[in-house]
Amino acid sequence: CYGKSLPNGKTYKQEMLEKIPLDLSRVHFVGSLPYGLYLKVIQASDVHIYLTRPFVLSWSMIESLSTGCLIVGSDTSPVREVIEDGENGLLADFFSPKQVADRVDEVLEHPTRMAEIREKARQTVLERYALSDMLGKHLELINQVANRTLTPTIGRETKPSLTLSKF
């Protein structure tokens, strides 16, 4: 979806299935879905595994949180901006498949214990990312950039008057 095509012409799914033996009765490749059906899949999921290197945070993580789907995410800066380990999701070392698997096991083995984390995940989105709040802030940011009134912050110690991290 985001990367280059493989030089051998295979899809990443084909490449992975050739290298990793998976129980396909337990792993679902749903492909592209209409938005309403996509949300139903997330709502039916026990866990959303979100691994990313330092990059921009994907909307899929915020949407998963909004449905109360529990996130096991990589302990990387974009994920830590949203997930507080043990509060509204779980973090694992990006470079440790065992730690990721252990965190997923923790979710699946203790569904009752995870209920509060799921609720806090949803609350995080309602409190910090609600469209009714974000729209005005985004328009303000656009106006500041367009009018050149946004204080430059690169290389400065002071905090800007408006940043996306506040949202």
Regions found by a protein language model. Name each.
Residues 53:
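Aromatic "clamp/platform" in nucleotide-sugar-dependent glycosyltransferases that forms part
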Residues 85-86, 90-97, 106-111:
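Conserved acidic donor-binding segment of nucleotide-sugar-dependent glycosyltransferases
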